[in-house]
Design a protein with these regions (language model features):
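N-terminal signal-anchor module of multipass membrane proteins
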Residues: 1-23, 216-222, 232-235
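Transmembrane helix interruption/hinge and helix-loop junction motifs
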Residues: 1-5, 46-56, 147-156
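Hydrophobic core segments of alpha-helical transmembrane domains in multi-pass membrane proteins
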Residues: 6-14, 53-65, 155-165, 214-220
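C-terminal ends of transmembrane helices
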Residues: 16-27, 62-75, 123-132, 166-175, ...
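Cytoplasmic-side transmembrane-helix entry/capping segments in multi-pass membrane proteins
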Residues: 28-35, 57, 75-85, 134-141, ...
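Hydrophobic, membrane-inserted alpha-helices
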Residues: 36-46, 61-67, 121-124, 137-146
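Long hydrophobic alpha-helical segments that form multi-pass transmembrane helix bundles
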Residues: 77-129
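Membrane-water interface signatures at transmembrane helix termini and the short loops
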Residues: 137-173
Length: 236
């Protein structure tokens, strides 16, 4: 019970940082970016309804680029970058668990999808040698490997909450007004918590599951749009 409450709390904090997207979007007041943000979400919903496999593959590729931005140089698009290892390692070490997760996402060929993630994860290990950076990468690879070995797929969640989230907030604080960033994160977390509480109390969970392709497509679209916004404020 306490563990589940903690997971919900951590999820709320993580979701809350997505509201910080509004800082660069509103600061530029570029309607094209705002329109693109909404369009990406709509396209992903439509795409996931038609072909969950392609939708999920695009999400995996975009997420790997996004996670690679957690490491220097952060203003480069790296594919495959070390962020692909974040997704590829669980596919290698927790194959059955990952395959069951892919089946829940209605992936048509889960084994082929796993192989793509594994190849990308292995290829991503070339990055520290190409960059001749042998300091942070071995430490991260060892730590993350241990994390996945102990916690399985939940290790990805812990990585996002305890590494990706602080890095993202730190970068935003360096670039924008720290008070605005922190307050936006707090407000976003409160809004996220209220929405999650409403969904749970009104027992919408079954309805969400019945329409999971729409929900998953929307979530993928929102996260892809978040990754796009991150690329924008990193001046790519």
């Amino acid at each position: 019970m306490i563990y589940n409450i903690l997971l919900i709390f951590l999820s709320i904090l993580f979701i809350g940082h997505g509201f910080c997207d509004f800082i660069p979007l509103l600061q530029t007041l570029n309607l094209r970016f705002l329109g693109l943000y909404i369009l990406i979400i709509a396209i992903n919903i439509y795409l996931h309804l038609i072909t969950p496999s392609i939708s999920t593959l695009i999400f995996a590729l975009v997420s790997s680029i996004h996670f690679s931005g957690d490491f220097y140089p952060r203003n480069e698009v790296k594919l495959p970058g070390i962020g692909f290892y974040v997704l590829g390692l669980p596919a290698m070490s927790k194959t059955l668990e990952f395959k069951n997760f892919l089946i829940e996402l209605n992936i048509t060929y889960p084994d082929l999808f796993l192989n793509i993630l594994i190849i990308g994860g292995l290829t991503s290990l070339l990055e520290p040698f190409l960059k001749q950076d042998h300091n942070i990468f071995p430490v991260f690879i060892f730590s993350y490997t241990l994390l996945i070995y102990v916690f399985g797929l939940m290790g990805i969640f812990y990585y996002m909450v305890f590494y990706h989230l602080p890095v993202s907030l730190y970068e935003l604080i360096e670039k924008y007004n720290p008070n605005i960033v922190i307050n936006t994160w707090i407000i976003g977390s409160i809004i996220s918590g209220l929405l999650i509480g409403i969904l749970i109390n009104l027992k919408y969970i079954d309805e969400i599951y019945d329409n999971k392709n729409i929900v998953i497509g929307g979530v993928f679209g929102l996260l892809n749009a978040h990754s796009m916004t991150t690329l924008i404020w990193r001046n790519i």
